Amino acid sequence: MAVYKNLSPEQTVLLQQGRVAGVDEVGRGPLVGDVVTAAVILDPNKPIAGLNDSKKLTEKKRDALYLEIMDKALAVSVGRASPTEIDELNILHATMLAMQRAVAGLTIVPESVLVDGNRTPDFGVPAHAVVKGDGLIAAISAASVIAKVTRDREMGELDARYPQYGFAGHKGYPTKAHFEAISAHGVLAEHRRSFRPVREWLEANS
């Protein structure tokens, strides 16, 4: 597996040749919910303007790009790993599993896969890790948007079920508001029990 850092424009173009799937993840850090990944194969004949790392985009822009990606991309797939799988495997291995599921779910088999970050799982096709790839490679940027919007919407649904936890605001991340909600209301089935704040609450309240 090659890991690319500080790509030149020529390297960036070279990596995007052929039928390439971009892959990114969202949700490694939260205390609750699935880790969500997406795989996207873009159509070179239908360019999408404004793609970037999803964290650098406004929610309104992400939502608009989500619709455009779903409309124009050749293939889009979402893969995930559950809190139970995260607890059993650890977050790194669960993320790799979710990425494999995303690529396996594509309706078109890619010739290669480009993953944001510094490592990739085995996809059965050539794969390369691209550091900060979500800001460099259009297909990874698109995957970043799909994964982010998907997970944020799921946190909104969880917020509707458990409004006292404030998931729509903190998205499950370990914020002061989330810690206070756990202290006041306890741990949910959707919480990741292997993550220290959740584990410590369970140990203190067992």
Curated annotation (Swiss-Prot):
PANTHER family: RIBONUCLEASE H2 SUBUNIT A, RIBONUCLEASE HII. Endonuclease that specifically degrades the RNA of RNA-DNA hybrids. This is Ribonuclease HII. It holds the Pfam family RNase_HII. Keywords: Cytoplasm, Endonuclease, Hydrolase, Manganese, Metal-binding, Nuclease. CDD domains: RNase_HII_bacteria_HII_like (cd07182). It comes from Shewanella amazonensis (strain ATCC BAA-1098 / SB2B). Belongs to the RNase HII family. One of its GO terms (biological process) is mismatch repair. The gene is rnhB. Its EC number is 3.1.26.4. It catalyses: Endonucleolytic cleavage to 5'-phosphomonoester. Its cofactor is Mn(2+); Mg(2+). The lineage of its organism: Bacteria, Pseudomonadati, Pseudomonadota, Gammaproteobacteria, Alteromonadales. Its main location: cytoplasm.
